[in-house]
C-alpha cells in the first residue's frame, strides 16, 4: 500500500490545496505542511492551481509612497523575522529548537505526543517497580550527624526502611493517577481528532490495555489491604 504522504504529494504537485489534501487523507493541515517540509515537496512548474486559490501582489498599494520599497514581511535583522523572536533572549538554544519544531504540530498532534509519552511511562514503571521478593527490604541512610560529648565524638545515623509491600502500594497509587491522566488525554484526542485519523486504531489498543491494567491494579490493591486479627477472650480456664 502506498504511503499517504506519497499519494498526497502527487495531488500536491497537481496543485491541490492544503485544506483539500487534509480532508482527503484524514489528517490536519499542519500534518500536510509537515510532510511538505520533511519530504521536500515541490510543485511542478506550470502546475495549475486548483480553483479557489487566491494570489495577491506583495508590497505597497499603487501610488502609496509611504511604503515605497517595502516588499512585505519583517525588515532584515528584525527579531520578528526569527521564529523564536522575543524568547531568544531568555531561553536556551535547545528549548528554542523544540519550540520551532512545535510550530509544525497541531493541537491534536501535541495531545497525541503526550498520550505516547504517558503510555510509555506507565509501561516503564511496571518494569522498574516490579517486586520479585515479597520479603525484600531497602535500607536507606536518611540522616547522619556528629554529636560531641564530654569525652568523645559520636556519629548518629538515621535509616529509613522500606518494605516491598510499601513500594508496591506507592507504585499502585502512582499508576492509578498516571492512568487517570492518560484517560483524560485520550478523551481530548477523541474530541479533536478527525473521524478517519489512523491513530484512532492505536488509541483503541492503548485504551484496552489501560482498562486491563486498571482491573489488575484494583485486584492487587484488594489483595494488599491489611488483614485484621481479632482476639477473643475465652475467660479463665479455671472456671
From Swiss-Prot:
Gene name linked to the record: yqaS
NCBIfam families assigned: TerS_not_xtmA
Species name: Bacillus subtilis (strain 168)
Listed name of the protein: Uncharacterized protein YqaS
InterPro entries assigned: XtmA-like_N
